[in-house]
């Protein structure tokens, strides 16, 4: 009887310790912590999640892929809900789903830098390659001060190995959390390093069950 009482008491102490240490609002990212990083709760909290309708994927400057090795999908700000337009400048994360636009012929558009891109409306996306699955992403909401932009852009880096471009396709996405504010950089290498940390942070958080359930929104 005495032994059983001690055993039960020990279980209660351990359970109490677990509950005291369990906080759904504590930061779950330790590995990639930087001074500028914001706390990421164990599950999305207000104002998240934010969800879009399907919006067009348009050409930007082409820097993400050509200069940084991190391709992005640009979306028009005027196609996004007000709650997303009102977000602070910075880096966010969530999930994205791309769909093709049927019945469109290939067309050529000119980027801001004067170069041309082919709009294929996603016709080369492959289900076999999981291109049309719900995928993790990081979102830059900002003016890209490193490049001296004076207007805000919305750029998604979808964390997936696409084999082809998909300008003209449509994307729907949710935003589940905020990684850090927008920063300026003295070197391109520092910018690339931070983006890669953002990507690893998003992958780590989005792989947890409380975040995985939000794939169902898309």
From Swiss-Prot:
Q: What's the chief localization of this chain?
A: other
Top-level enzyme category = transferase
Q: Name one Pfam family in it.
A: Flavokinase
Q: What is this protein called?
A: Riboflavin kinase
Per the UniProt entry, the Enzyme Commission number(s) are 2.7.1.26
Query: Carries keyword Mitochondrion?
Result: yes
Natural source organism = Saccharomyces cerevisiae (strain ATCC 204508 / S288c) (Baker's yeast)
Q: Which family does it belong to?
A: Belongs to the flavokinase family.
**Which residues does the Swiss-Prot or TrEMBL record annotate as the active site?**
155
The note describing how and how many cofactors are bound reads: Zinc or magnesium.
């Amino acid at each position: 009887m005495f032994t059983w009482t001690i055993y039960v008491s020990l279980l209660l102490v351990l359970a109490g310790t677990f509950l005291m240490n369990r906080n759904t609002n504590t930061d779950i990212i330790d590995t990639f912590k930087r001074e500028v990083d914001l706390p990421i709760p164990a599950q999305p909290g207000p104002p998240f999640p934010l969800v879009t309708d399907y919006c067009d994927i348009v050409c930007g400057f082409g820097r993400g892929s050509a200069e940084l090795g991190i391709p992005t999908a640009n979306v028009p700000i005027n196609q996004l809900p007000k709650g997303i337009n009102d977000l602070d400048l910075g880096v966010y994360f969530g999930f994205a789903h791309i769909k093709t636009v049927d019945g469109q012929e290939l067309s050529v558009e000119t980027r801001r830098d004067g170069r041309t891109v082919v709009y294929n409306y996603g016709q080369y996306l492959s289900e076999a390659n999981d291109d049309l699955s719900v995928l993790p992403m990081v979102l830059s909401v900002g003016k890209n001060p490193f490049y001296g932009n004076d207007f805000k852009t919305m750029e998604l880096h979808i964390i997936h190995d696409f084999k082809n471009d998909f300008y003209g396709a449509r994307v729907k996405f949710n935003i589940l959390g905020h990684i850090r504010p927008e920063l300026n950089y003295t070197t391109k290498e520092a910018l690339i390093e931070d983006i890669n940390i953002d990507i690893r942070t998003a992958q780590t958080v989005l792989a947890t069950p409380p975040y995985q359930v939000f794939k169902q929104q898309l």
